[in-house]
């Protein structure tokens, strides 16, 4: 298995986010692309990242392959990536993942070997679920709202009421409500749920990777989905379970 991309910084940014959510994970390599699909340790959130083979400069994978890595250790190596670097990732044995970071301008070539892990984990299958509404907004605005509300409360409520996207929270000493008018997105219903700000603040660290975020809600309010693009390589989606009402 081997791939090469000039969008190395995007992969670095993705693992920078994932290291605070996941520990040891399996990477699923197929002829179609690379995927991480796993639950966090508390089994509250599901992470689904898929990078499409057709978007790499080079991609070679004849058969499906599963290999385990420690996300933090992987990021420690990817952290060496800077602007204009090219990343090559290759697996030639069961023991190591080989990473190569090249920069033609600086004329540098750095190579690493990361020890692989044997992770006994059944692959999760995400059922095809029709999302009822998707609200697109600047990722930096959504991050700021979540960060501000975490100073007031531990949870927030996200509501889509026709053309209004409402984010609100109730704290011990103050409440906050922010309303955004969605003039370009037609929706005639009303959906809402309560979600953990701890997790939302972890997910919104992906803001630096993508200028916009899609906040997707489904009719049964079982979970919320945040979707970010990983540059032009693919997408990173976070599924967060809706908190059960105390009522």
Where are these regions (language model features)?
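DNA polymerase sliding clamps and clamp-related checkpoint/processivity subunits
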Residues: 1-19, 24-151, 157-247
């Amino acid at each position: 298995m081997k791939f090469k991309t000039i969008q190395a910084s995007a992969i670095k940014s993705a693992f920078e986010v994932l290291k605070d959510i996941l520990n040891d994970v399996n990477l699923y390599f197929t002829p179609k692309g690379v995927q991480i699909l796993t639950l966090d340790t508390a089994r509250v959130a599901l992470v689904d990242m898929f990078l499409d083979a057709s978007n790499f400069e080079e991609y070679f994978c004849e058969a499906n392959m599963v290999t385990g890595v420690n996300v933090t250790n992987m990021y420690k190596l990817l952290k060496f990536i800077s602007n204009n670097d090219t990343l090559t990732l290759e697996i030639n044995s069961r023991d190591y993942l080989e990473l190569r970071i090249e920069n033609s301008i600086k004329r540098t070539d750095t190579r690493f070997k990361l020890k692989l892990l044997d992770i006994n984990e059944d692959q999760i299958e995400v059922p095809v679920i029709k999302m009822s509404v998707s609200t697109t907004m600047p990722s930096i605005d959504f991050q700021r709202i979540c960060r501000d509300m975490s100073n007031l409360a531990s949870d927030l409520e996200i509501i889509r009421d026709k053309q209004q996207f409402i984010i609100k929270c109730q704290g011990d000493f103050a409440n906050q409500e922010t309303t955004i008018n969605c003039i370009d997105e037609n929706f005639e219903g009303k959906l809402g749920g309560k979600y953990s700000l701890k997790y939302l603040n972890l997910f919104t660290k992906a803001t630096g990777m993508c200028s916009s975020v899609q906040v997707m809600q489904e009719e049964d309010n079982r979970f919320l989905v945040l979707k970010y693009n990983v540059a032009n390589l693919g997408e990173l989606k976070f599924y967060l379970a809706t908190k059960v009402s105390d009522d």
